[in-house]
UniProtKB/Swiss-Prot annotation:
Source organism per UniProt: Schizosaccharomyces pombe (strain 972 / ATCC 24843) (Fission yeast)
Covalently lipidated residues, kind S-farnesyl cysteine: 509
Modified residues (Cysteine methyl ester): 509
Subcellular location: Membrane
Record-given protein name: Chitin synthase regulatory factor 2
SUPFAM superfamilies noted in UniProt: HCP-like
Gene: chr2
Keywords: Lipoprotein, Membrane, Methylation, Prenylation, Repeat
Propeptide: 510-512
Task of the protein: Involved in chitin biosynthesis.
């Protein structure tokens, strides 16, 4: 858990912070299994690039969040107001050097970060945005396989059947059936084959529920949600629906006009990318702003990118950009963690170009990288692994933790992580991971298959000569077999001696 002393303003005294990993021995000597709260981690979607934003495919999903400001309804009622004039509501005084009058950071929910509101400095940035936001960090808002952020991470088949039983009753409330439809759409995207097969058997009935809800008009509370779910079906092919981008956009637009936050974000994406409608960047900004006003994390991050780089014919404004980036970082979660990563880059590079309003802070950068890594962002996981490996960002070197992060990322087929994991297996990690040249070669081949240059060279050298004989860490096959045959109690005892037993595994990394 990351803890601060709750200071306010831009000057903080950070307490000593501990980052916990419960490392348990595995039956495989060359692997460390961790027991943590990272079960929800999943590979993030990687999208292709476009001219102004990373391209978002039509099946990108958006997520409902509650409104945090009464200003959202006021803004939405001002239909004749230009989007550029609307944006002036966010920052009334462009020349202000602080956001204290624009937003009350103490009132923002920071439960996702387990931090008090004093973490993020609310001063405007002073740096070259083109330097801080490199091409890698300008990737699209990462999505997940989950449809709605307020859903559980997984659904059991029994829960799905129980929900259907309630929804199929004759005197069923519309909200009950709507809840089943939400679960069905999520289960269809899950990794459980039984869940997918069950939804496939009920897809026609579920689609009939949706169409009946929409045909009733705005006569029940969940009408906007039903419109959105039906739009998801037409836009992504859910419930085996034939994809129809024009119909999906029409339904998204109807839901957005009823103040549905995710639908507003989806309409903005459609207008920006031209999915089912003619491209209209001015209207896209209007809907991005509406979604951001409804506290949609992805929309807040998009607005930050627009102002940082001056995209879509909008004048570059670092003050407004930093406002949205701070909000996006405060509300970031496992579906939209990118704002954390971008803010970490700013703290890592510091204000090298203007008045020094955003000071260099490696400690805060590491905290933000680590939170984004816990949320599953691949770039952040790679950065955290390097920090533990090389002692960067004022972090103590810890090869075991570095190995854990590299291995987690290597399982997602990241070539750099696979190459690093190969080096760890080649050289070993203290007395926890024994050298294993064969396994090192396998991971190097996997990285080479992904066109990693160093891994390709390494594999070619292995084919020409016995590289492993030149290393000082090579162990004999007999010794390796002897180590692999250690009983589980012996492994636990060995890990305990190295202070990696569950009850004692609380190594500290000073971040202040």
């Amino acid at each position: 858990m990351l803890v601060s002393n709750g200071g306010t303003g831009s000057a903080h005294e950070w307490d000593r912070t501990t980052i916990d990993y419960d490392i348990e021995p595995s039956s495989d000597t060359h692997a460390i299994e961790i027991s943590s709260n990272d079960d929800y981690l999943h590979p993030l979607a990687q999208f292709k690039k476009s001219e102004e934003f990373d391209e978002v495919p039509t099946n990108t999903l958006i997520h409902e969040v509650p409104s945090f400001s009464d200003s959202a309804s006021n803004i939405q009622s001002q239909r004749n107001l230009s989007p550029f004039k609307e944006l002036e509501i966010v920052s009334k005084k462009k020349s202000e050097q602080t956001f204290s009058s624009a937003v009350d950071f103490s009132a923002i929910n920071v439960k996702n970060l387990n931090l008090k509101s004093g973490l993020f400095d609310p001063e405007p940035p002073s740096y070259d945005p083109d330097y801080a936001f490199n091409q890698r960090s300008l990737q699209s808002d990462p999505g997940s396989d989950e449809m709605f952020r307020n859903f559980k991470k997984s659904i059991s088949l029994e829960e799905l059947k129980s929900s259907y039983k309630l929804a199929s009753a004759e005197m069923c409330e519309p909200e009950t059936r709507l809840s089943f439809l939400q679960l069905a759409l999520q289960a269809e995207k899950s990794s459980s084959r039984r869940n997918r097969e069950y939804v496939a058997r009920k897809k026609e009935e579920a689609f009939d529920y949706l169409t009946s809800f929409v045909s009733q008009g705005n006569s029940f509370f969940g009408y906007s949600e039903a419109l959105y779910l039906l739009a998801v079906c037409y836009g992504t092919g859910a419930l085996r629906t034939e994809i129809n981008e024009k119909e999906a956009y029409r339904l998204y637009k109807m839901a957005a006009d009823l103040n549905h936050v995710q639908a507003a974000y989806r309409v903005a994406i459609c207008l920006q990318m031209g999915f089912g409608v003619t491209q209209n960047t001015e209207e896209a900004i209007h809907y991005f702003f509406r979604a951001a006003s409804g506290q949609h994390v992805g929309a807040m991050h998009r607005m930050a990118l627009i102002y940082f780089r001056g995209l879509m014919s909008v004048k570059r404004d670092p003050v407004k950009a930093m406002y949205y980036l701070n909000l996006g970082a405060l509300e970031a979660d496992h579906e939209f963690p990118q704002a954390l990563y971008d803010l970490a880059e700013l703290y890592e590079h510091g204000s090298s170009y203007l008045d020094g309003l955003l000071e260099l802070s490696p400690r805060k950068a590491f905290v933000l990288y680590h939170i984004a890594a816990k949320y599953g962002l691949k770039d952040a996981q790679l950065r955290v692994a390097r920090c533990f490996e090389l002692g960067q960002l004022e972090c103590d070197i810890n090869l075991v933790r570095s190995f854990v992060w590299y291995r987690r990322l290597a399982r997602k087929r990241n070539p750099e992580a696979m190459w690093k994991l190969s080096q760890f297996y080649l050289n070993g990690v203290d007395d926890v991971i024994y050298p294993n040249p064969e396994l090192a070669n396998e991971w190097a081949k996997a990285a080479a298959y992904k066109n990693h240059h160093l891994a390709s060279t390494f594999v070619q050298d292995v084919g020409k000569e016995d590289v492993f004989e030149k290393t000082s860490i090579t162990i004999s096959n007999e010794e390796r077999k002897s180590r692999n045959s250690e009983s589980l109690p012996k492994k636990k005892k060995r890990l305990s001696m190295l202070s990696f037993k569950r009850s004692k595994n609380r190594e500290s990394c000073i971040i202040s």
